[in-house]
């Protein structure tokens, strides 16, 4: 069974026991969280349920396995001939989740 969930303004296709990295979610390591904004749910051999915009009664349960930071991204701005240069770096904080269960009532 698979589902398409909405987390942090992005969409992720998840299966049971899959591991995904999403934007930081506050919580302790090992704690369980539930996603209720499920955009689509289905099985590979059967027709899927597509939400309008979400599937009612569908829940994805996940466990927080790690809190980490992504690779550094360099932002560089320059205006030619004006001696204008700005350099900044950014590291996005991420949460690693293990999908435990996908249910639809």
Swiss-Prot record:
- Record key words, sorted: Ribonucleoprotein, Ribosomal protein, RNA-binding, rRNA-binding
Which PROSITE patterns does its entry note?
Answer: RIBOSOMAL_L21 (PS01169)
Q: Short name of one Pfam family for this protein?
A: Ribosomal_L21p
Q: Does the keyword Ribonucleoprotein apply?
A: yes
Q: Name one GO biological process term.
A: translation
Q: Which InterPro entries match?
A: bL21-like, bL21-like_sf, Ribosomal_bL21, Ribosomal_bL21_CS
- Carries keyword Cytoplasm? no
Query: What domain of life is recorded for the organism?
Result: Bacteria
Single GO molecular function: rRNA binding
GO cellular component annotations of the record: cytoplasm; ribonucleoprotein complex; ribosome
Could you tell me what this protein does?
Answer: This protein binds to 23S rRNA in the presence of protein L20.
Q: How does it assemble?
A: Part of the 50S ribosomal subunit. Contacts protein L20.
Would you identify the family this protein belongs to, as annotated?
Belongs to the bacterial ribosomal protein bL21 family.
Protein name from the UniProt record: Large ribosomal subunit protein bL21
Organism of origin is Rickettsia canadensis (strain McKiel)
